[in-house]
């Protein structure tokens, strides 16, 4: 899939998934604008990581440097007003009877995509990129393929333009996401993802591990760690 004569807008949080998607976007589109959201997230350090990732990824490739465009951040304080979650307040992370963790922020990706699409429309951009995936441990409803497709249809109808939402990680495991990073930018890009992106729900970006920074115990850290270890095993086997 290549759209090298097209612009695209990437929803960029500073995490592993959106960081990997940045490499994918720069490999597939001629101009990439990034957009981030400050919504009172507990792991606010990821917002600081965004700048470091953007600065360092442009040094990995002249082509990527030429294609990387502007960055925008929007404030969405409304989520904390809608109710507490373990992402927007200091709650202990627990799971309900259906296995859904209280890190789920209801409607978050729908909000994000709606704002991104409105911004894209004003800038004549018809391609959005988001790092959602169904294989993520969480089972967040708004990360699932049918939810993204429904949102794409609603936005296209509501804006009167065909909007395409790209989800390059939708069917990938975390190990496969590490593999994609290696394929896109080699070991230097893997190192950038490992050292500069942030996943930890508890906002720990000081404790270092082989797979990156984090507390090592929250669900996001465990998922990242397990994916890294599986990735290394497959890499060594080959």
Swiss-Prot record:
Gene3D superfamilies: HUPs. Transmembrane segments: none annotated. One of its GO terms (molecular function) is ATP binding. ATP binds at residues 12-22. It catalyses: 7-carboxy-7-deazaguanine + NH4(+) + ATP = 7-cyano-7-deazaguanine + ADP + phosphate + H2O + H(+). GO terms for biological process: queuosine biosynthetic process. Keywords: ATP-binding, Ligase, Metal-binding, Nucleotide-binding, Queuosine biosynthesis, Zinc. Its EC number is 6.3.4.20. It is an enzyme of class 6 (ligase). Pathway: Purine metabolism; 7-cyano-7-deazaguanine biosynthesis. Zn(2+) binds at residues 200, 215, 218, 221. Its cofactor is Zn(2+). Catalyzes the ATP-dependent conversion of 7-carboxy-7-deazaguanine (CDG) to 7-cyano-7-deazaguanine (preQ(0)). Belongs to the QueC family. This is 7-cyano-7-deazaguanine synthase. It comes from Lawsonia intracellularis (strain PHE/MN1-00). The lineage of its organism: Bacteria, Pseudomonadati, Thermodesulfobacteriota, Desulfovibrionia, Desulfovibrionales. The gene is queC.
